[in-house]
Amino acid sequence: MAAGVATWLPFARAAAVGWLPLAQQPLPPAPEVKASRGDEVLVVNVSGRRFETWKNTLDRYPDTLLGSSEKEFFYDAESGEYFFDRDPDMFRHVLNFYRTGRLHCPRQECIQAFDEELAFYGLVPELVGDCCLEEYRDRKKENAERLAEDEEAEQAGEGPALPAGSSLRQRLWRAFENPHTSTAALVFYYVTGFFIAVSVIANVVETIPCRGTPRWPSKEQSCGDRFPTAFFCMDTACVLIFTGEYLLRLFAAPSRCRFLRSVMSLIDVVAILPYYIGLFVPKNDDVSGAFVTLRVFRVFRIFKFSRHSQGLRILGYTLKSCASELGFLLFSLTMAIIIFATVMFYAEKGTSKTNFTSIPAAFWYTIVTMTTLGYGDMVPSTIAGKIFGSICSLSGVLVIALPVPVIVSNFSRIYHQNQRADKRRAQQKVRLARIRLAKSGTTNAFLQYKQNGGLEDSGSGDGQMLCVRSRSAFEQQHHHLLHCLEKTTCHEFTDELTFSEALGAVSLGGRTSRSTSVSSQPMGPGSLFSSCCSRRVNRRAIRLANSTASVSRGSMQELDTLAGLRRSPAPQTRSSLNAKPHDSLDLNCDSRDFVAAIISIPTPPANTPDESQPSSPSGGGGSGGTPNTTLRNSSLGTPCLLPETVKISSL
């Protein structure tokens, strides 16, 4: 509407002051105030992807972002679109909800990202359709458990390394929960595990009967009564280790209240408490039963192995996650036991010498039958009792078998989650090790490079820099291109000096060409030549273009070029193939030099009578500093000039 007003308003103002008569030019049509209609098409641009829908489609849900007036904050007046910088793939499912009224959860998308999109558009997760609701809840539960495990692992010290200024409590807690962080923590881990095993074994061995003493050889007694001092010292040492571990864990715990309420803390207390109670309780007949009961609690020390066994922890997590299924199983078994015990009692009530004396006495038979154990100490004798006993056995199989797949699936899920977490941690360790190795290798290579003279200090004061004395990357690329040209064409490029790619060192090759030119002569130490590719030893035979004879490269003519001196003008011969840096380009090297190349071309056929022989230049045998390049034919023995000079542009 503002655009229409801006169109006709200047005409009206000009006519009012007499600048422009209204009759000279027709006015544009006056803007019409359009009432908002439900059949208006709205364009929604989500990260560049345009979606079109009816306005009344979005108005179905006025409590959401797209159905309320809040979407006007995202309106772009220039394009006439509602722009949202969100995921367009997710928005497709959101828009389908406005169209159909059913919200579907995409399987290929992250469940957390899907929840974030729903929260942005003002949609609640309860709107997910029944077809996707179960899968949505399972994925959300699995994701929440994984995030909780990652948070616990990070708190336990399995995450990134602690900062340098970490406190003693943090280091102790990390050592207890993740023993592989240091050698001392690993030693303490194995020591506590050893004493747990010793304590459990001693608790078992002290009940074994031993031979009598020399004074009473016929009297048998347990090993605990035969050697009380040894077992007491062993138990004392184990309890002291367990007490010290518990106190250190309590001191280092991030939240002491949470640690005291944890299951492992209760196991630790139950494992060490009977020992201290036995020290202060006198051994007499009045409290002997209570003392024996306290000694029974020592067997709970075996649960301390759960800290050292990953499988036991997985089993505990499985039972915790299957609490509802286990509760259903217990409730079903309780109902079935009560029902069948009552039926069996009244079915066997009329018989003499029956073992089903009461309904609680029949509980034992029902439990043994439903769990398919069948000890045989209690059996029905009547026909009705046998029939109901068979029904009890079959119902027990069904009741117990139904929750088992759920428990197994939860165990498998938790186990695979743990395996993936271990794999991620192992991969992270490998990546960190590779990064450290790469850094170490790079540092060593740099130091070796500097030691070999590859770098030198230039400048003084704050402007001191490292100047690379090796050849530039441009020149190395040029050498590689020369080698590729030699492989692709029939020409051979040869340099008289060797070039070391490792440190950019130039060394004399000590090789001479068959050519008699200047470039084929041995060069002194001050020469500016360097080589890229050495001359190949095996020279294959080729067939000439205008000849029927097959000759080798040994009989081919060589076109030699002169070496370009330092800061010399651009040559007009084939030596322009050599790396020639631009004069205005400041390369990171000490010197600018050119490389002389020897290009071998096939020998043309012998001169026919029609062709005219060019005259030999003066001093034809020399290869001195003449700019003209000579062509020699070993078969003719007469030097001749090349009719035209081949020019190749420099790289």
Swiss-Prot record:
Residues 1-183, 253-263, 309-323, 416-651 are cytoplasmic. InterPro entries: BTB/POZ_dom (IPR000210), Ion_trans_dom (IPR005821), K_chnl_volt-dep_Kv (IPR003968), K_chnl_volt-dep_Kv4 (IPR003975), K_chnl_volt-dep_Kv4.1 (IPR004054), K_chnl_volt-dep_Kv4_C (IPR024587), Shal-type_N (IPR021645), SKP1/BTB/POZ_sf (IPR011333). Residues 474-489 are annotated as: Required for dendritic targeting. It is a multi-pass membrane protein. Zn(2+) binds at residues 104, 131-132. The chain crosses the membrane at residues 184-205, 231-252, 264-284, 288-308, 324-345, 387-415. GO terms for biological process: protein homooligomerization. SMART domains: BTB. Component of heteromultimeric potassium channels. Identified in potassium channel complexes containing KCND1, KCND2, KCND3, KCNIP1, KCNIP2, KCNIP3, KCNIP4, DPP6 and DPP10. Belongs to the potassium channel family. D (Shal) (TC 1.A.1.2) subfamily. Kv4.1/KCND1 sub-subfamily. This is A-type voltage-gated potassium channel KCND1. It comes from Mus musculus.
